[in-house]
Regions:
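Class I SAM-dependent transferase core
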Residues: 300-328
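Solvent-exposed, charged/polar functional surfaces in cytosolic regulatory/catalytic domains
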Residues: 31, 35, 194, 198, ...
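Hydrophobic (often cysteine-bearing) scaffold residues that line and stabilize catalytic clefts
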Residues: 17, 21, 213-217, 290, ...
Length: 381
């Protein structure tokens, strides 16, 4: 296997574009993965802008396993570790293989989330390529062992809402960046123009892309939450979102429209991969019975995605037990201290002079519980 690969790249030079021998590298990768599991899928994206997405994406039954990034022969791989491109890939998946065809470097992250070289090997030098090739059997065994570790990498399980929100937030940020990057594309500009026409004429493109990226991610989450045992994709996401989230259902239609832009497609697939493979039961248990998971998770997500935005918009979820206590106290106070409300909140149903105002309505939690309390009082009567 190794001798055949080296023979196919004998004319490799630092001057040649990294794409020149990409097909031979892809053949090697396919043979390596077949050593372990033929169900592993290697997706190659040759026509891409520099740094927009990895050269190869490895997945298993839709779950993202890791990335492989191919560089020009002779490039110093260790010098790339602090580049924006590599930091981006590691933030999305801390399982990355760098190669210049002859050297292979397996990279992850340390306890401080900094790039960490886990293992590296060299299978030949450029000088050796120009001579009769006799690779050592041990070199091939070492290469197989390196990729065995890479392919068998298991990400830390996500078992609570906070970790899940932290996992989704960088993908959403990069989705926002991609929307800004491709704002001249008709698929993006037409949505922006609709937002300006029907929602807010003074909307900036950055605010638009931020809001759209959040909404698209959240629409995928809502779809999975509503159908935890169904695989969510761009074809069924709209119908999977609860009907009472009508606006988000409508926004989900934009997902298919944006899917035609490769970098956005890749990021949407990353989000879908995460959502379809998370333990939704653990997320629901973490959110517990005192919280509406459909609404509460947005606060958790926004605190990970952009805590300053969360604070400026006042996105805070009050636990249901606290809301009930406040509503019951208000009901009692009306009965004992206000002659126009002898029946408490129920009196508001018959007296138009009694008004309920919520100055920071947010999830409408207080308002909903107030109406429910009024209705129960009526039923009891």
């Amino acid at each position: 296997m190794l001798k055949e690969y080296l023979e196919s790249i004998k004319d490799l030079t630092p001057e040649k574009n990294e794409l020149a021998h990409r097909s031979f590298l892809q053949n090697l990768l396919n043979r390596l993965k077949d050593h372990f599991n033929k169900e592993f899928k290697i997706e190659h994206e040759p026509k891409r802008e520099q740094g927009s997405q990895p050269d190869f994406r490895i997945s298993y039954q839709g779950l993202n396993i890791g990335y492989i990034e191919n560089k020009r022969a002779g490039e110093d791989l260790s010098q790339l570790l602090k580049s924006d491109q590599i930091l981006k890939y590691l933030e999305l998946n801390p399982n990355l293989m760098l190669t210049d065809y002859l050297n292979f470097m397996w990279v992850g992250k340390d306890e401080n989330n900094a790039p960490l070289i886990k293992k590296e090997i060299s299978i030949a030098s450029l000088d050796e390529l120009s001579k009769p090739l006799k690779p050592k059997p041990q070199t091939e065994r070492d290469l197989i062992e390196l990729f065995k570790s890479f392919f068998n990498h298991e990400a830390a399980p996500i078992t609570n809402a906070k970790d899940f929100a932290t996992h989704l937030s960088p993908r959403t940020r990069y989705l926002k960046d991609a929307l800004i990057k491709y704002q001249e594309k008709t698929q993006v500009s037409s949505i922006f123009n609709n937002f300006k026409e029907y929602l807010y004429e003074e909307l900036s493109f950055e605010d638009f892309s931020d809001a759209l990226a959040q909404t698209l991610t959240y629409s995928l989450f809502l779809a999975k939450l509503n159908h935890p045992f169904e695989k969510i994709n761009l074809d069924n996401v709209r119908s999977s979102i609860p009907k009472n989230f009508a606006v988000i259902r409508e926004m989900a239609d934009f997902l298919k429209k944006l899917d035609g832009i490769k970098e956005i497609q890749w990021l949407l697939n990353e989000i879908l991969s995460s959502i379809n493979h998370v333990d939704m039961d653990s997320i629901l248990k973490d959110l517990n019975d005192d919280k509406d998971p459909y609404l509460h998770f947005y606060e958790t997500f926004l605190s990970a995605y952009d805590p300053k935005l969360r604070e400026s918009k006042g996105v805070y979820y009050t636990p249901d037990s606290v809301v009930k206590f406040i509503i019951n106290a208000l009901d009692s106070l009306l009965k004992t201290h206000f002659k126009d409300a002898p029946l408490g909140l129920k009196s508001a149903l018959d007296n138009e002079n009694i008004k309920l105002l919520d100055f920071a309505t947010g999830h409408r939690h207080f308002f909903i519980r107030s109406v429910q309390k009024s209705a129960r009082n009526e039923e009891n009567k």
